[in-house]
A protein has these predicted regions:
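Short mixed-charge
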Residues: 236-265
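Glycine/threonine-rich flexible loop motifs
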Residues: 177-183, 219-226
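Short glycine-rich His-centered loop
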Residues: 106-125
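Short catalytic helix/loop segments, enriched in acidic residues and glycine
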Residues: 126-140
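Glycine-rich phosphate/pyrophosphate-binding loop and the adjoining helix
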Residues: 2-106, 129, 280-283, 287-366
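Charged, often glycine-rich, active-site loop that binds/positions anionic groups
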Residues: 153-183
Length: 366
């Protein structure tokens, strides 16, 4: 507990931003704009009724229309929790049990961070995907390993795949950020088909995570950054939304000020990071990814698990895949990064991996 707080009043949430609420006409215009295909032309009366139903849900702010009582294990068993969140919560719990069960194979999560694929506008696969395939060959050849591939290019090429932006609840108060995230789906705002409830269990079940990404304007790709931001709930997030009565900012501030333990839900997992660029930024992106993972108390598998390189430095984009074909050194470096992660994961599971200081208590949680 902060000495000055001592159970007193929490600061009131600061407000003053303009309202984003729409009137009925504008809401229905935006809602109807998604039905442009001629197949919908004979269905205008039906669409009118559907648009009116959607407007009613929006007007009444029905974020989570289907709920049930939280039940045993929560601070307030009678609180109505969204059934979507309960399902996500159970999936995360199940993933943690798989992670902790030493009789299960070791699990690797291999992430392709590029949004490019031949299945949509770019017309060509990404180099990140090819590098991920090289890494996958290493994992697939090892005994006692299962690999889950998370291809973030699906955000740009697959129907119904979305990752919505983090709403930054953590910046209001740590306890307001729920684990897993409870901000989505928001049915009244049409914020549905969010992928993160499938992604959280992949991270939780993994003993090792390997991220392969290009540099996009001195940063990670936008799909990868969306996932990174939405993983904030894994680093200090509140696993019991009933303690904050849902999204009650004042209640969350009181909880944090009374003393928050910042649970590290992904701590102890090992990671590897491979970043490739064409001109500039690879080192900074690699460093920012590694720093982020370290801050969440994940541990680098070893020096060769972190790699930043340029492919076709200052060469035409049109021939970048040819440059990768010719660069057998980076191909082997990616294999070595995967081998390092694999070796680290197996050593950690057998109790032989030493991460000095891992069990120390930090005087600063934030």
């Amino acid at each position: 507990m902060f000495d000055w707080f001592k159970g007193g009043k929490a600061p009131q949430p600061r407000k003053g931003m303009p309202s984003p609420r729409l009137d009925e006409a504008e809401f229905k215009r935006r809602f109807r704009s998604q039905f442009q295909d001629q197949a919908f032309d004979p269905l205008q009366e039906e669409l009118d009724r559907i648009a009116h139903a959607a407007w009613t849900a929006y007007e009444q702010s029905r974020k989570s229309p289907r709920t049930r009582k939280a039940g045993p294990g929560f601070a307030d068993p009678n609180y109505d929790l969204a059934v979507d969140w309960i399902a996500a919560h159970e999936a995360v719990k199940s993933a943690q049990q798989r992670h902790d069960d030493s009789s299960n194979p070791a699990s690797i999560l291999l992430i392709n961070g590029s949004s490019r694929s031949e299945h949509t506008c770019p017309g060509e696969m990404s180099k990140s995907f090819r590098l991920a395939e090289i890494a996958h060959e290493v994992f697939a050849s090892a005994e006692g390993i299962e690999t889950n591939i998370l291809d973030l290019s699906r955000l740009a090429s697959e129907y119904g795949r979305k990752i919505y932006p983090c709403k930054a609840c953590f910046s209001t108060a740590a306890a307001l950020c729920h684990w897993p995230c409870s901000c989505y789906p928001n049915y009244s705002l049409g914020q549905t088909q969010d992928w993160m409830n499938d992604i959280y269990p992949l991270w939780v079940a993994a003993h090792g995570i390997m991220i392969i990404t290009p540099v996009n304007w001195y940063h990670t790709s936008s799909p990868l950054k969306l996932m990174i931001d939405r993983l904030v709930c894994a680093d200090g997030g509140n696993p019991d939304p009933t303690r904050t009565h849902g999204k009650d900012a004042v209640a969350a501030k009181k909880l944090e000020l009374a003393g928050w333990d910042y649970p590290r839900h992904l701590a102890g997992r090992l990671f590897s990071v491979v970043v490739h660029g064409d001109v500039e930024g690879a080192e900074n992106v690699r460093r920012s990814l590694s720093d982020w993972l370290r801050f969440m108390r994940l541990c680098p598998a070893g020096p060769t698990a972190e790699l930043d390189r340029y492919i076709g430095y200052w060469k035409p984009y049109a021939t970048s895949h040819d440059e990768l074909d010719a660069d057998t050194a980076i191909q082997e470096e990616v294999r070595n990064a995967a081998r390092t992660l694999l070796e680290g994961v197996m050593a950690k599971r057998s109790g032989q991996f030493v991460a000095a200081g891992e069990e120390l208590s930090s005087p600063r949680q934030k």
